[in-house]
Amino acid sequence: MSLSLDGVDLVHADGQRALADIRLRLAAGERVALIGPSGAGKTSLLRVLASQWRPSAGRVELLGEEPWALSAAARQRLRARIGLVHQAPPLPPRQRVVSAVLAGRLGQWPLWKSLASLVYPLDRAGAHDALQRLDLGDKLFQRCDQLSGGQLQRVGIARVLYQRAELILADEPVSAMDPVLAGHTLALLNREAAARGSTLLASLHAVDLALQHFPRVIGLRAGRIAFDLPAGEVDRAALDALYANEQLQAERASPASEPAVVHIPRC
């Protein structure tokens, strides 16, 4: 079992409940999409799974470990086995792309190697290989602030590939890309995860991409799991219920003279 959540709740300091009674299991090597309306709790769930946020209640097990039962040092070692792809990668603007990719293994290297790599990239070939898979091999020595949003997202994915993470958590990893590039990137991420035996959980607003690229789809609504189904069994009724509020808003915005057309939001 790659990850397991039993009865997980998350309540923020202001009293807002982000997650409620989450029960979820992913086997090693599974590839799963997480969908739902804005504010459903997708990012909160990924942060709990990355052991960045401690749940208010319930049990979390990641890669055979209970993160909040570990010492701080052991928990940091566990995090080094987990790759988190951010919607907006937190990369220093003046940092070179090569350094951004190599940072994926800072938690796995001894301190001297991590410090040395910040001054002089020690594995340029490895970084280039990861970038080349995402058609960014020519950006190796560019500064991060010279890249587009979609390019920065692909750098974030290259970083996780270089990290060789056992568990990949991707939070809206292709939101800044056009549909063709987004599909190409998700296909590559799935192939890489399958080839390495890594578990992949990706949150997506683009429902069509989730259904096309992932064998299993989880719908999250108001902090709760609304459905957990094989992609082929996710029907219109399930999606209508998942996005009910957004559909109602779309209907109200439609002119009275035109029939209301409900579109499942893409991003």
Swiss-Prot record:
It comes from the Bacteria. Residues 3-247 form the ABC transporter domain. Keywords: ATP-binding, Cell inner membrane, Cell membrane, Membrane, Nucleotide-binding, Phosphonate transport, Translocase, Transport. It is a peripheral membrane protein. One of its GO terms (cellular component) is plasma membrane. ATP binds at G36, P37, S38, G39, A40, G41, K42, T43. Its main location: membrane. Signal peptide: none annotated. Its EC number is 7.3.2.2. SMART domains: AAA. One of its GO terms (molecular function) is ATP hydrolysis activity. It catalyses: phosphonate(out) + ATP + H2O = phosphonate(in) + ADP + phosphate + H(+). It is found in: Cell inner membrane. InterPro entries: AAA+_ATPase (IPR003593), ABC_transporter-like_ATP-bd (IPR003439), ABC_transporter-like_CS (IPR017871), MetN_ABC_transporter-like (IPR050086), P-loop_NTPase (IPR027417). Pfam families: ABC_tran. Belongs to the ABC transporter superfamily. Phosphonates importer (TC 3.A.1.9.1) family. Part of the ABC transporter complex PhnCDE involved in phosphonates import. Responsible for energy coupling to the transport system. The complex is composed of two ATP-binding proteins (PhnC), two transmembrane proteins (PhnE) and a solute-binding protein (PhnD). This is Phosphonates import ATP-binding protein PhnC 2. The gene is phnC2.
